[in-house]
UniProtKB/Swiss-Prot annotation:
Signal peptide limits: 1-35
Organism: Metacarcinus magister
GO biological process, one term: circadian rhythm
Entry protein name: Molt-inhibiting hormone
Principal location class: secreted
Function: Inhibits Y-organs where molting hormone (ecdysteroid) is secreted. A molting cycle is initiated when MIH secretion diminishes or stops.
Xref: PANTHER family: ION TRANSPORT PEPTIDE, ISOFORM C (PTHR35981:SF2)
Top-level taxonomic group: Eukaryota
Length: 113
């Protein structure tokens, strides 16, 4: 027969294990959903995450300059292949990097429909 202390310890351990499993499952589902959204925008993202981060940084800077949270989303639309991205390049004064940025956007968007 189990004592009261052993029973309480067993239930606490079961509860803790349940919470750890639920947290792990939630984390995995969030990561998959985030990756799916990013992959839908840029089909050639796998293996090019460093390029994506460099190009995305322009959109984040642009959003911070104008204090408009929707600006970053517009800038990233169609895997950075849009007028808003070009506008952000000019707004962040990175026109000297334009040829490099076009090359990176081309790599990220390769296979785009």
């Amino acid at each position: 027969m189990m004592s009261r202390t052993e029973s309480r310890y067993s239930s606490q351990r079961t509860w803790l294990l349940s919470m750890v499993v639920l947290a792990a499952l939630w984390s995995i589902s969030v990561q998959r959903a985030t990756a799916r959204v990013i992959n839908d925008d840029c089909p050639n993202l796998i293996g090019n995450r460093d390029l994506y981060k460099r190009v995305e940084w322009i959109c984040e800077d642009c959003s911070n300059i104008f204090r408009n949270t929707g600006m970053a989303t517009l800038c990233r639309k169609n895997c950075f292949f849009n007028e808003d991205f070009l506008w952000c390049v000019y707004a962040t004064e990175r026109t000297e990097e334009m040829s490099q940025l076009r090359q990176w956007v081309g790599i990220l968007g390769a296979g785009r429909e």
